[in-house]
Amino acid sequence: MPEAVYRCAKCGREVKLDLSTTRDLRCPYCGSKILYKPRPKIPRRVKAI
């Protein structure tokens, strides 16, 4: 399985984790369990009514 990129909520660093081998999701730098999946940087267009 490919690595997934997450952003730590506590220290703000990007973390690459291999989900097939990792049992618990923690930041390897600060140990925080709160990780966010970063949004794509592509802007969305919403049509106004």
Curated annotation (Swiss-Prot):
Main location as per UniProt: cytoplasm
Alphabetized Gene3D superfamilies for the sequence: RNA polymerase ii, chain L
Catalytic activity: RNA(n) + a ribonucleoside 5'-triphosphate = RNA(n+1) + diphosphate
Annotated InterPro entries: RNAP_P/RPABC4, RPABC4/Spt4, Rpo12
Tree of life domain: Archaea
Enzyme class: transferase
Cofactor names: Zn(2+)
GO biological process: DNA-templated transcription
EC number: 2.7.7.6
Pfam families: Zn_ribbon_RPAB4
Cellular compartments annotated: Cytoplasm
Cofactor-binding details, from the entry: Binds 1 zinc ion.
GO molecular function: DNA binding; DNA-directed RNA polymerase activity; zinc ion binding
SMART domains: RPOLCX (SM00659)
Keywords for the protein's UniProt record, in alphabetical order: Cytoplasm, DNA-directed RNA polymerase, Metal-binding, Nucleotidyltransferase, Transcription, Transferase, Zinc
Record has NADP as a keyword: no
Positions with a binding annotation for Zn(2+): C11, C27, C30
This protein's GO CC annotations: cytoplasm; DNA-directed RNA polymerase complex
Family affiliation: Belongs to the archaeal Rpo12/eukaryotic RPC10 RNA polymerase subunit family.
Assembly notes: Part of the RNA polymerase complex.
Function per UniProt: DNA-dependent RNA polymerase (RNAP) catalyzes the transcription of DNA into RNA using the four ribonucleoside triphosphates as substrates.
Record protein name field: DNA-directed RNA polymerase subunit Rpo12
Gene name for this UniProt entry: rpo12
